[in-house]
Amino acid sequence: MMLKPSIDTLLDKVPSKYSLVILQAKRAHELEAGAAPTQSFKSVKSTLQALEEIESGNVVIHPDPAAKRAAIRARIEAERLAREEEERKIKEQIAKEKEEEGEKI
């Protein structure tokens, strides 16, 4: 039985078979955890779905791990700042409502 996608096709997308296994496992775990798929799949199993994504080029190994970490840190920092801004707005709204209540009494 011929497996699709073929190992030869997949090895054109990644530097080594070891990298392929790691990339497939990580992506399969992401799919199992509920990550959004990048395409529609022929396969039912998440491991084969990951291989389909690798074959299509939708999932790749990041060429610069330091840049990837920096991008993740920047995203986390942006999310933190957005949360802080939201909390500040809520506190201002609460203070404004308390002030309005004090004027009514």
Swiss-Prot record:
EC class of the enzyme, as a word: transferase
Oligomeric and partner information: The RNAP catalytic core consists of 2 alpha, 1 beta, 1 beta' and 1 omega subunit. When a sigma factor is associated with the core the holoenzyme is formed, which can initiate transcription.
Record EC number: 2.7.7.6
Keywords, sorted A to Z: DNA-directed RNA polymerase, Nucleotidyltransferase, Transcription, Transferase
Catalytic reaction list: RNA(n) + a ribonucleoside 5'-triphosphate = RNA(n+1) + diphosphate
InterPro entries reported for this sequence: DNA-dir_RNA_pol_omega, Pol_omega/Rpo6/RPB6, RPB6/omega-like_sf
Organism: Streptococcus equi subsp. equi (strain 4047)
Protein role: Promotes RNA polymerase assembly. Latches the N- and C-terminal regions of the beta' subunit thereby facilitating its interaction with the beta and alpha subunits.
Domain of life the protein comes from: Bacteria
GO CC, one annotated term: DNA-directed RNA polymerase complex
UniProt-listed GO biological process terms: DNA-templated transcription
Presence of keyword 4Fe-4S: no
UniProt GO MF annotations: DNA binding; DNA-directed RNA polymerase activity
The protein's name: DNA-directed RNA polymerase subunit omega
Gene, per the UniProt record: rpoZ
Family named by the database record: Belongs to the RNA polymerase subunit omega family.
